Amino acid sequence: MINASTFISRFPEVLGSFPESPWHLPSVAERIVVQKAKLLSSEYRQTGNAFIHHSATVEPHVTLKGAIIIGPGCFIGAHAYLRGGVFLDEGVVIGPGCEVKSSFLFRKSALAHFNFAGDSIIGEGVNMEAGSILANHYNERSDKTIRAIIEGTVVVLPVTKFGSLIGDGTKIGANAVLSPGTVLPMGSVVKRLELIEQVPAA
């Protein structure tokens, strides 16, 4: 069992009350966001199934599909697409043209522009430069099993889709690609154009 708080310091505060393992959280993101929305203050306005803090900025032509929480001071750039249950903590930036699917982003993290983050848990103060991708599915493999390395041991994840678990303060360079099941500790650095494939195909 992975201890998510060793990667994301605020994990217990934000998601610790839910019994699911970190691997299962994205698959039930819609339900979790709906439950958390019941506890929101009157400082949030509801638009469809999206709950947006009054201090957040949502630019024109943003698509919000499914249950979404956009926290205080967040910025969502034009033509961004959020779907499938998304939680944005305080001060998160989603730049123009980004897609975020079934993911949790902690305080002050940023996707610069034209990023994809699928079925992922992204810690506090993480920065993803333009075009970097958190892939959530092995389209190119006949074996779709997702594996991760936890404390030096290869673990088979109990889900068919999972992107990345990104520790606080991680920096991800432009056009980098993180393969499904990537786990990065706090303060990691991924170089521009780098492919992270922690568990190669068998």
Regions found by a protein language model. Give the residues of each.
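Terminal amphipathic alpha-helical/low-complexity segments used for targeting or macromolecular assembly
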Residues: 1-49, 54-55, 182, 186-187, ...
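Short amphipathic alpha-helical segments with coiled-coil-like heptad repeat character
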Residues: 28-29, 82, 111, 178
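ABC ATPase A-loop
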Residues: 51, 69, 87, 165, ...
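Glycine-rich active-site/cofactor-binding loop and its immediate structural neighborhood
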Residues: 54, 58-97
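Glycine-rich hexapeptide-repeat left-handed beta-helix
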Residues: 102-202
